[in-house]
């Protein structure tokens, strides 16, 4: 063993070392002043999680199983879709109870907030229609009737060329474009392949449709309905997410342990990157720019940086099914369907290396806490206290 001389370790360096360690320590975690409302499918309930204390405040019973939860854009309320009952329920975060409910059909499929954030649009299969629910009244407004049974839909975003909805029908292998201003069907596009999902490009000028049976992404011109390009995919397109500027589309699904990255504006596939075993749902963070990918088969979360390199792995609960970012971007909330809990991950822990891992290619990031929320959580929304 080499002898340590006085010149190598000084009294000054010993005094300064605790200060250096403190300067490198992570900032103290603070809660988010708001609630996370978690829809539980099997237990037919909504769990209200206090994000300042990270515990469930209340379980709100529902009349039917929920499938989606959306936040109100201005106040502490959420909207819960119960598709088999054809009902949308409004839950008030202050009273922690159902404040209003509306039923505009027998069987619903999905719902989305309008670009103006003043109404919900609910897609119904029975009867086949797209129904507007203004938030102020929560009563059925305009009803746009559809010629074929719908399976999914998407609305143009704010700032797009027009206010439209694209509705996909698997049975008829078609995409129907309707005007949200006039309520008229503008055109029906023959998709050729079964449309598994449909989205507008951010400017509203093109419609993108993924087909699981044919493993393809089909891009159509919204104005004419003509096919722009058909892009073959190495996966069945089941999950997707879009960057905030609309310049990147990320697709995952069965067939390959990878995520496909598409450039919608240049209508080309940029690259395919490995993203853990059987990649599922995804979300994006900013500053730093990370792609978070759920891996249900391994009960984990894969984190890729902007150069698509693996930077972290996080072990979460069983079968992670949805990823939600808190509005302050401080936490990632992971819903785990099988284990019935929600993993809370600090985004800071994903970007700051821990001691002893500086030379590692990637690291294992910790879970901040786990919260039991109910049987089969399938959707959630975070709203601040107002």
PLM regions: where:
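N-terminal secretory signal peptides and thylakoid transit peptides that target proteins
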Residues: 1-19
């Amino acid at each position: 063993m080499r002898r340590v001389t006085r010149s190598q370790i000084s009294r000054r360096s010993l005094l300064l070392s605790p200060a250096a360690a403190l300067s490198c320590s992570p900032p103290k975690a603070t809660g988010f002043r708001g609630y996370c409302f978690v829809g539980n499918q099997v237990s037919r309930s909504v769990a209200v999680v206090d994000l300042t204390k990270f515990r469930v405040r209340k379980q709100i019973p529902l009349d039917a199983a929920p499938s989606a939860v959306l936040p109100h854009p201005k106040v502490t309320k959420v909207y819960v879709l119960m598709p088999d009952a054809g009902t949308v329920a409004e839950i008030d975060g202050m009273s922690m109870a159902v404040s209003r409910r509306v039923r505009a059909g027998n069987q619903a499929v999905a719902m989305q907030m309008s670009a103006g954030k003043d109404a919900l649009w609910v897609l119904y299969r029975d009867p086949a229609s797209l129904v507007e629910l203004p938030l102020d009244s929560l009563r059925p407004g305009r009803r746009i009737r559809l010629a074929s049974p719908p399976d999914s839909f998407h609305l143009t975003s704010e700032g797009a060329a027009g206010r439209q909805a694209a509705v996909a029908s698997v049975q008829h292998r078609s995409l129907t474009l309707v005007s949200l201003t006039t309520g008229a069907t503008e055109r029906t596009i023959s998709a050729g392949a079964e449309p598994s999902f449909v989205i507008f490009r951010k400017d509203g000028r093109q419609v993108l449709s993924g087909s699981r049976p044919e493993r393809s992404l089909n891009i159509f011109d919204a104005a004419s309905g003509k096919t722009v390009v058909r892009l073959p995919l190495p996966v069945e397109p089941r999950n997707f997410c879009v960057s905030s500027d609309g310049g990147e589309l990320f697709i995952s699904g069965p067939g390959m342990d990878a995520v496909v990255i598409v450039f919608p504006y240049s209508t080309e596939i940029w690259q395919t990157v490995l993203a853990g075993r059987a990649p599922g749902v995804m979300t994006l963070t900013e500053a730093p720019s990370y792609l978070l990918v759920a891996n249900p088969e391994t009960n984990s979360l894969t984190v890729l940086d902007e150069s698509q390199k693996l930077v972290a792995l996080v072990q979460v609960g069983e079968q992670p099914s949805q990823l939600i970012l808190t509005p302050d971007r401080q936490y990632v909330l992971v819903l785990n369907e099988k284990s019935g809990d929600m993993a809370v991950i600090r985004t800071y822990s994903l970007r700051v290396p821990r001691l002893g891992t500086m030379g590692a290619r990637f690291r294992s990031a910790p879970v901040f806490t786990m919260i039991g929320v109910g049987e089969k959580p399938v959707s959630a929304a975070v709203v601040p206290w107002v």
